[in-house]
Amino acid sequence: MVQRGSKVRILRPESYWFQDLGTVASIDQSGIKYPVIVRFEKVNYSGINTNNFAQDELVEVEAPKAKPAKK
């Protein structure tokens, strides 16, 4: 299950970041077509480093790291 902070691989062939890794910045729950915002290290030709994707266009590579428990 993709969640905020997950490392994901992009499966959309027409995307600049096809087969690249990115980090999930947020997930919109309102029912839009491309609810997952993914942030990347490198920028595209327009200088943008984020893009929206559908859940089925992403494969989770690494789950987000757990936060340490508060004392």
UniProtKB/Swiss-Prot annotation:
GO terms for cellular component: photosystem I reaction center; plasma membrane-derived thylakoid membrane. Transmembrane segments: none annotated. The keyword Glycosyltransferase does not apply. It comes from Nostoc punctiforme (strain ATCC 29133 / PCC 73102). Stabilizes the interaction between PsaC and the PSI core, assists the docking of the ferredoxin to PSI and interacts with ferredoxin-NADP oxidoreductase. InterPro entries: Elect_transpt_acc-like_dom_sf (IPR008990), PSI_PsaE (IPR003375). GO terms for biological process: photosynthesis. It is a peripheral membrane protein. The keyword Membrane applies. Keywords: Membrane, Photosynthesis, Photosystem I, Thylakoid. SUPFAM superfamilies: Electron transport accessory proteins. NCBIfam families: PRK02749.1. It comes from the Bacteria. This is Photosystem I reaction center subunit IV.
